[in-house]
């Protein structure tokens, strides 16, 4: 198991949930957290603890975004019209790494970030190597021609545990994904329950 995989599964263990729905997640085999004290019975969380956990889970899901970056996304969401929690999800799903993952061009969101950073992705015909790049409705994401035959790309497109959401128009033959609309919470195929309203409560304290 690579260091990247270990870090990813450590998030699963800390949350006590298989947050990406992966068959190899260690929480499929046990119900306690990482470390020598992981098997201790957990007490009831305070309201703050519940809110913090919701934030950590959402941050972790999107490749463990840094606190500074995640808080910046929250601030932007709070300035938009409408529900801040829904806006937060919409902004997270506009990230290029999230779309590359949703389109099944790679098998994990961690791999999506690395794939973008290594220059394998174009947006509207131009190379973009910033994983946090914010897409707009109508943007077309594509895998570079020279990268389409990479083994992990071909494998990811066949993964059975993930369906592509309907806010993307994906062509796996051409390895393209058109961003059709900004989704809300109910549109996003999270394998576990995400609670952005608790994240809003955390930052509103």
From Swiss-Prot:
Cited SMART domains: Ribosomal_S4, S4
Query: Keywords in UniProt for this one?
Result: Ribonucleoprotein, Ribosomal protein, RNA-binding, rRNA-binding
Q: Which GO terms describe its cellular component?
A: small ribosomal subunit
By its UniProt entry, which InterPro entries does this protein fall under? Ribosomal_uS4, Ribosomal_uS4_bac-type, Ribosomal_uS4_CS, Ribosomal_uS4_N, S4_RNA-bd, S4_RNA-bd_sf
Any single Pfam family the record assigns to this protein: Ribosomal_S4
Subunit description: Part of the 30S ribosomal subunit. Contacts protein S5. The interaction surface between S4 and S5 is involved in control of translational fidelity.
This protein's name? Small ribosomal subunit protein uS4
Q: Which organism is it from?
A: Bradyrhizobium diazoefficiens (strain JCM 10833 / BCRC 13528 / IAM 13628 / NBRC 14792 / USDA 110)
Q: Give the organism's phylogenetic lineage.
A: Bacteria, Pseudomonadati, Pseudomonadota, Alphaproteobacteria, Hyphomicrobiales
């Amino acid at each position: 198991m690579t260091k990247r995989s270990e870090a990813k599964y450590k998030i699963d263990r800390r949350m006590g949930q298989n947050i990406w729905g992966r068959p190899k997640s260690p929480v499929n085999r046990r119900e306690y957290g990482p470390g020598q004290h992981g098997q201790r019975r957990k007490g009831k969380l305070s309201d703050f603890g519940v809110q913090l956990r919701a934030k950590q889970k959402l941050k972790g899901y999107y490749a463990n975004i840094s606190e500074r970056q995640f808080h910046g996304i929250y601030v932007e969401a709070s300035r938009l019209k409408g529900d801040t929690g829904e806006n937060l999800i919409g902004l997270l799903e506009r990230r290029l790494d999230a779309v590359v993952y949703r389109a099944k061009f790679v098998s994990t969101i961690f791999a999506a970030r690395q794939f973008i950073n290594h220059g394998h992705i174009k947006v509207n015909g131009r190379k973009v190597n910033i994983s946090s790049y914010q897409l707009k409705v109508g943007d077309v994401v594509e895998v570079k021609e020279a990268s389409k035959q990479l083994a992990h790309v071909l494998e990811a497109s066949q993964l059975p545990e993930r369906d592509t959401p309907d806010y993307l128009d994906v062509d796996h033959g051409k390895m393209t994904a058109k961003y059709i609309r900004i989704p809300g919470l109910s549109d996003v195929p999270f394998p576990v329950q995400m609670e952005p309203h608790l994240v809003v409560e955390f930052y509103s304290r």
